[in-house]
Amino acid sequence: KWNIDLLYNTHYEQNRQTTDTYSHHTLKNNIYDICQHNDIDRKGITHYVRTGAEYKFNDNAHINLAYTGVFNPNNDNHSYSDGNITTADNRTKKEARMHNIALDYLSGFGMKAGINYTPYHSESHQQFTYKDNKNQTSEFHTTSGQTIDRWKIYVDQSHTLPREWTLNYGTSLTYASDHNTQFYHTQNGTDMSELNTDNRYNEYTYDFYVGFSKNMGERLSFSASITGEYYKTARYHAWAAYPTAELTYVMTPAHILQLAFTSDKTYPSYWDLSESTGYISGYEEVQGNPMLKPSTDYSANLNYILKNKYIFSLAYDYQPDLFQQLAYQSTERLALIYKTLNWDYQQSFSATTIIPFKIGHWLDSHVTLQAEYRQAKCNKFFDLSFNHSKWIGLAMLQNNIILSTKPDIRMELTGLYLSPSIQGSYDLNHIWAIHTGIRWNFANQKASIQVKANDLFNSMEGNIDVTLRNKGQYMDMHTNNYSRNITLSFTYKFGGYKEKQHKPIDTSRFK
């Protein structure tokens, strides 16, 4: 039996952001007060297409071939910076395309196998003009590109054993080849060729895992697995193990305990691993870091579920080698450098309570309260270090409201508040947000019209204050990002159609 599906959608996005930066910059025992105002406009269109063909041998075995394409034909980015030491005009045009071909097979005896190939290419052109406080003008043009070829092959096997045991094991091999280039072309005679970069990067990741699960009667269930990984690049290679375990104990139907431990790894983007330098303004720049390492995330969670409704959780999260991009005021020149570096670690302890409640048949609500202690430590941040910690609070109320049953009109209303928090050496202000939406279901629940408004008051990303005070580093930044968005959608289901869920293609490491 054959099944064939085809999906196409397109997405246009326009974003506006303003940033005000006040930098109290210490350089060679002198202090420079630098003020910069940046206006940034971004717009672009994305086309997404997917087609797949599946052949079912029987109910338990099938083979599937799928193609996915994502195309960004024209993304424009224009930023204008005005300050007391420099003004700059920065225009960038970018286009990108990604293809993915995946072949997957599921046997009738629990084996899964597959291979997929992902080629990706992007190129951008930047026109940069800046004028210093002496009215001297400089111009340059950059061309940059990224070409990635990624292959993955995997085999998984699952066995159902006697006495309610389940055994799983498998292996996978991923190879990625990345080619990053950036070339500077000056337009006023200044030689900038020392900033040109042409980097090739090969990455090998080999994984193998084994796991099992067991139901011990009606009250106790347990599962565990361990993944071994060998990761290799030209500058870094290491073996690592990632265990997971989960235990569920049903004391009574009204009292359930869950204990879980997980571990995973996060890889830096391929562009961050390049040696490139990009300019935001005449004062701000972004540098790559070819010495970046993957980070690991270890998490432990204890949940107590009361009456199948109320949830009380304790969690601990430890992330060695966590990498994030932070700003640094150079001690060698007047430059604010943004660079992604590995920290020693970030860790957090948190306690969470989720309380649902209903009022009649028209209101179904959930209250979430969380208290978190977060610590970020880095002993080698350029020529500095930081050890930053803070208590953080989160409160969220989610409401599902039935406005009418005939006609069927429902409303969603969510509000959240996050207290002042930290990011590395930064202090961040509090944020809050309101999300809402209304849905009308009709035609015997086959059709619906929905209007949604996210961040209704533009308060979540529209009013961010960043404060840096660390061993002579002194900076204040205010960012206003237009994050409010309103969507209108119409859905009609033909017959018994159910939308298929497809595993998304991982593009998180692409530029």
Briefly describe each language-model feature range.
Residues I34-D39, N84-R91, Q136-T143, T190-D198, ...:
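Extracellular loop and loop/strand-boundary signature of outer-membrane beta-barrel proteins
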Residues W2-N9, T46-N74, D89-A238, P243, ...:
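Face-selective signature of the C-terminal outer-membrane beta-barrel domain
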Residues A395-F442, A447, N454-V466, N470-Y474:
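C-terminal beta-barrel architecture of Gram-negative outer-membrane proteins
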Residues Y201, K265-L314, Y318-P320, L336-S350, ...:
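Outer-membrane beta-barrel signature, preferentially recognizing the C-terminal barrel domain
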Residues F442-K511:
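C-terminal beta-signal and adjacent terminal beta-strands/loops
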Residues T10-Q14, G69-P73, Y117-E123, L173-H179, ...:
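Transmembrane beta-strands of outer-membrane beta-barrel pores
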Residues D344-P420:
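Gram-negative outer-membrane beta-barrel transporters
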Residues R16-Y32, V70, N75-R91, E123-K134, ...:
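Outer-membrane beta-barrel translocator domains and adjoining extracellular loop/strand segments
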